[in-house]
Each structure stands twice: as C-alpha cells, then as structure tokens.
Amino acid sequence: MLPQHSDIEIAWYASIQQEPNGWKTVTTQFYIQEFSEYIAPLQDAVDLEIATEEERSLLEA
C-alpha cells in the first residue's frame, strides 16, 4: 500500500524538467494537467452535492 498523497508526489516529480544548462524546472502546465486528474472528480462530487465531508476537506486543503 502506498502512503497517503503519494500520487501527488509522483505528479510533482514527473513535472520536473531537466534543462540543457543543467537546471531543473517545474513545468507548471504539466503540473496543473496532472493534478486536474485528481481534483476534477472531487470537484464534480462537490458540485453534485454527493461528496463526503472527507472529500470536501481534501478539496479545500
């Protein structure tokens, strides 16, 4: 079993790009795209008023 929020860490590390000059940068667009996969279902549940209190708190965190 993976630790809580490990999928978020995976998305974060995947968004880091190695630049030709050796710098590592986070590509915001990729980061937002990855997180939208996790946020959209929670937002839909809140909008449809079927989210639990735990799900609401995850979205507000």
UniProtKB/Swiss-Prot annotation:
UniProt record similarity statement: Belongs to the tfa family.
Source species: Escherichia coli (strain K12)
Role description: Might play a role in cell growth during glycolysis.
Record's miscellaneous remark: Encoded by the cryptic lambdoid prophage DLP12.
InterPro entries: Phage_T4_Gp38_tail_assem
Protein name: Protein TfaX
Reported phenotype of the disruption mutant: Produces less H(2) during fermentation on minimal glucose medium, but not on complex glucose or complex formate medium. Alters production of organic acids when grown on minimal glucose medium; complementation was not reported.
Listed Pfam families: Caudo_TAP
Domain of life: Bacteria
